A protein has these predicted regions:
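Short helix-capping segments at alpha-helix termini
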Residues: 48-54, 104-106
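Single conserved hydrophobic/aromatic residue that forms the stacking wall/gate
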Residues: 1-9
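C-terminal helical cap(s) of enzyme catalytic domains, especially alpha/beta-barrels
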Residues: 88-107
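Catalytic cores of alpha/beta
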Residues: 65-78
Length: 107
């Protein structure tokens, strides 16, 4: 679906991946290795379509991101950021998640 994107729009596009079984209150978080693997496929597919220009398109992971898995997801080489939901409902928890990710020194 992204084949028709022009060079100008590539810089305005973000890709967010969330496994269907990780969505919602009863969602089950994906193992970190699974999320990294899927993001690697996303990154390689974008490179096949757009070459090196694809490296400017951020690929975010969402899907039951929480305080327990956020930093492990955040440091993965093909995950450019996190697309969070419920954890952001509580400002203190969200601030804690951000602080924990920033403390990794990554990204």
């Amino acid at each position: 679906q992204s084949r028709g994107l022009g060079d100008v729009y590539k810089r305005q596009v973000w890709i967010a991946y969330e496994p269907v079984w990780a969505i919602g209150v009863n969602g089950i978080p994906a193992p970190v290795e699974y999320a990294q693997e899927k993001h690697h496929v996303i990154r390689e597919t974008l490179r096949e379509l757009y070459g090196e220009a694809a490296d400017v398109v951020p690929a975010l992971y969402g899907g039951s991101v929480n305080l327990e898995n956020a930093t492990r997801l955040f440091v993965q080489p093909d995950i450019d950021g996190l697309y969070v939901g419920r954890v952001a409902w509580d400002a203190k928890r969200f601030a804690g998640l951000i602080a924990d990710c920033l403390a990794t020194g990554e990204k």
